[in-house]
């Protein structure tokens, strides 16, 4: 079991502890629960889905990397597939606050990059900030997404984001988590291919500046992240953050990164290169390459 879960596990009810401990045994537990694992936990505890998600929030919050604020926020995104995806806020010392990943973004990006096609609900241990409410409005589940907060009645996103501005106002039809393929030829070694594939499935309807990042770890594991734009621009999630989020959720630390590749267009309206390099160097990675999409 990864050390980050040890203290959080002791806060759970005894029956839930006993049921989930075997699932957490792998130090690289992927911070997600398959539908059958959710059913197993429900059977062991007698909890319905909503109550179980609340009970598991301490484990999601344990995934946070709040190196600046030391304020851990946890989120659990529930996919239409039945899978549950953990998320936690991420802050990067030596970078800028603009590189921060919020817990809701973490859980949603986690689900998206794992192939989930839509979300039913998200459970969070603190009220979503305006940034996250706007980020969620980019999803194909839209304002119908159910938000679950401790001690409050569940509401759809539209309750928390009235008179919302979103993709429809800009006549965007393809939404975040919809299937997308930008069709760039995939070639090169495994890491280069992963970066191009990540760019191919990114969501960039506003700038038309597709990009993807792939990170290779010392043990050969590869994590990739896709760019996720937002109608309000600022809540956009860069591709590096998507990859770093997966890396962290899977129990790895930044020093494990031995090589990184960014895939983007040379003539794109928005360029990720400088911000990607600056953040990776702040995390100790010096071997950074760029492949141009053709």
UniProtKB/Swiss-Prot annotation:
Binding site for substrate: 89-91
InterPro entries: APOBEC/CMP_deaminase_Zn-bd (IPR016192), CMP_dCMP_dom (IPR002125), Cyd/dCyd_deaminase_Zn-bd (IPR013171), Cyt/Deoxycyt_deaminase (IPR050202), Cyt_deam_dimer (IPR006263), Cytidine_deaminase-like (IPR016193), Cytidine_deaminase_bacteria (IPR020797)
Main function: This enzyme scavenges exogenous and endogenous cytidine and 2'-deoxycytidine for UMP synthesis.
Disulfide bonds: none
Organism whose genome encodes this protein: Klebsiella pneumoniae (strain 342)
Top class in the EC scheme: hydrolase
Pfam families: dCMP_cyt_deam_1, dCMP_cyt_deam_2
Protein name: Cytidine deaminase
NCBIfam families from the UniProt entry: cyt_deam_dimer, PRK09027.1
Family recorded in the similarity comment: Belongs to the cytidine and deoxycytidylate deaminase family.
Protein keywords: Hydrolase, Metal-binding, Zinc
